[in-house]
């Protein structure tokens, strides 16, 4: 990969965007950003609190602004929030400003990876987690697919293996 281009990771919660993103950035000697962590850094509060106080709409506005600013940088790896693709503006910016990698995973794997995580506001509801994740998948998977340059399934693979697969695919293109 001669020139440094941006790599944007999209996919559902629990797909491994943050873990794989850190690994990928380290291997490629690029800066890593996580849009949720950036929102937390800027607000001084965790994502769940922002969701509670501002609602999903307020959170998505912050997310859109953060992603817009981060995607203007060069040579970064960005792990986006699972719902960031709901914004057409964000989808357009991700597509225009870098390579979009869709990290795909099964509902079963999402459940296993997120079951004890209290920092997932969309799972802090009365409905069963499986039902919530299935509804989110039905809504968002077509949006991930719409903007993906590359799709990789992360089930049963380490972050390093997935990062290597991404690097291989990028070197071919």
UniProtKB/Swiss-Prot annotation:
**GO function terms (MF aspect):** ATP binding; magnesium ion binding; shikimate kinase activity
Q: Does the keyword Signal apply?
A: no
Task: Identify this protein by name.
Answer: Shikimate kinase 1
Give the EC number(s) listed in the UniProt record. 2.7.1.71
Q: Where ATP is bound, by residue?
A: 14-19, 120, 157
NCBIfam families xrefs: PRK05057.1
- Per its database record, what is this protein's job? Catalyzes the specific phosphorylation of the 3-hydroxyl group of shikimic acid using ATP as a cosubstrate.
The protein's superkingdom reads: Bacteria
Q: Which residues bind Mg(2+)?
A: 18
Q: Does the keyword Acetylation apply?
A: no
Details of cofactor binding: Binds 1 Mg(2+) ion per subunit.
Top class in the EC scheme:
transferase
Annotated catalysed reactions: shikimate + ATP = 3-phosphoshikimate + ADP + H(+)
User: What cofactor does its activity depend on?
Assistant: Mg(2+)
One of the GO biological process terms: amino acid biosynthetic process
Pathway stated in the Swiss-Prot or TrEMBL entry: Metabolic intermediate biosynthesis; chorismate biosynthesis; chorismate from D-erythrose 4-phosphate and phosphoenolpyruvate: step 5/7
List ligand-binding residues for substrate.
Answer: 36, 60, 82, 140
The cellular location(s) given in this protein's UniProt record come to: Cytoplasm
Subunit info? Monomer.
- Specify the signal sequence span: none
Keywords, in A-Z order: Amino-acid biosynthesis, Aromatic amino acid biosynthesis, ATP-binding, Cytoplasm, Kinase, Magnesium, Metal-binding, Nucleotide-binding, Transferase
């Amino acid at each position: 990969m001669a020139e440094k281009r941006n790599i944007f990771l999209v996919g559902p919660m629990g797909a491994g965007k943050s873990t794989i993103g850190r690994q990928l950035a380290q291997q490629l000697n690029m800066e890593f950003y996580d849009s949720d962590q950036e929102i937390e850094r800027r607000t001084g509060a965790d994502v769940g609190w922002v969701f509670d106080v501002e609602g999903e709409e307020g959170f998505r506005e912050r997310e859109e602004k953060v992603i817009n600013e981060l995607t203007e940088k060069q040579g970064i790896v960005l792990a986006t929030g699972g719902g960031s693709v709901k914004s057409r503006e964000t989808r357009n910016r991700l597509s225009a400003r870098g390579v979009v990698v869709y990290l795909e995973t099964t509902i079963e794997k999402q459940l296993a990876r997120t079951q004890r995580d209290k920092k997932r506001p969309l799972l802090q509801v009365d409905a069963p987690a499986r039902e919530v994740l299935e509804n989110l998948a039905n809504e968002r998977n077509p949006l991930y697919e719409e903007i993906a340059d590359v799709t990789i399934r992360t089930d049963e693979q380490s972050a390093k293996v997935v990062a290597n697969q991404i690097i291989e695919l990028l070197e071919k293109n």
